[in-house]
């Protein structure tokens, strides 16, 4: 009876994880592509223009921050659902994946706070008038740390996603080809971020190549878990 309850919880967790994957992907893409990229607000290397853009589009910028907070709140729920689903496969590895992903969300929230602080100063005309050009540049650098911090975020996302996808592959809950693609795309993301740290000049070249595969993986996995669910082998009595 207890085993049956556990399996039922896994089925429900799988459906929930699928839904959360898709919702988090939608909110994440909105924030990154509509607010941050292509940069209608943020102009790299031009602090004054960035400050002017944020002041002129403060509501949009605030929506982007709120959207990011929602995205990472969803991520926490997703991490929990994946843990419930994969705990019976290997509890220790599932916990390791949870810790990796929680570090990811924690760092991301710190980045969001920095972005919010920069906006608070930049959007206040009285504050802005009190700053000289060097101080405005410093505020711009504070905002630029958002992008830099997300390199570290992506590293921990890659680590956690690799472990979760390994457990999905080992469990046989989903098609192995889908889990294998998840492992590949997660490792690709992980390696690419270290490459950017060591060779920053290649960042613009490899970003599409490293984020594209994992985006495809999370969308495909989300649809599969939500609409197909998982196949959990029955334990021998």
Question: Which residues does each PLM region occupy?
Answer:
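Hydrophobic, aromatic-enriched alpha-helical segments typical of multi-pass transmembrane helices
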Residues: 1-237
């Amino acid at each position: 009876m207890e085993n049956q309850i556990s399996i039922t919880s896994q089925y429900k967790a799988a459906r929930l994880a699928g839904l959360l994957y898709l919702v988090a992907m939608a909110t994440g893409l909105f924030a990154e592509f509509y607010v941050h990229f292509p940069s209608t607000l943020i102009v790299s290397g031009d602090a004054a223009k960035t400050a002017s853009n944020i002041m002129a589009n403060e509501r949009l910028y605030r929506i982007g921050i709120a959207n990011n907070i929602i995205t990472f709140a969803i991520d926490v729920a997703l991490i929990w659902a994946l843990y419930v689903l994969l705990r019976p496969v290997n509890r220790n590895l599932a916990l390791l994946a949870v810790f990796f992903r929680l570090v990811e969300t924690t760092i991301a929230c710190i980045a969001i706070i920095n972005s919010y602080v920069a906006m608070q100063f930049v959007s206040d005309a009285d504050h802005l008038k009190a700053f000289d050009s060097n101080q405005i540049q410093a505020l711009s650098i504070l905002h630029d740390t958002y992008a830099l911090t997300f390199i570290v975020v992506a590293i921990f996302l890659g680590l956690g996603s690799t472990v979760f996808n390994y457990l999905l592959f080992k469990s046989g809950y989903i098609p192995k080809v889908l889990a294998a693609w998840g492992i590949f795309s997660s490792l690709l993301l992980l390696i690419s971020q270290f490459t950017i740290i060591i060779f920053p000049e290649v960042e613009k070249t490899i970003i599409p190549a490293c984020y594209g595969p994992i985006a495809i993986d999370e969308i495909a996995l989300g649809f599969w878990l939500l609409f197909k669910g998982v196949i959990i082998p029955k334990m021998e009595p």
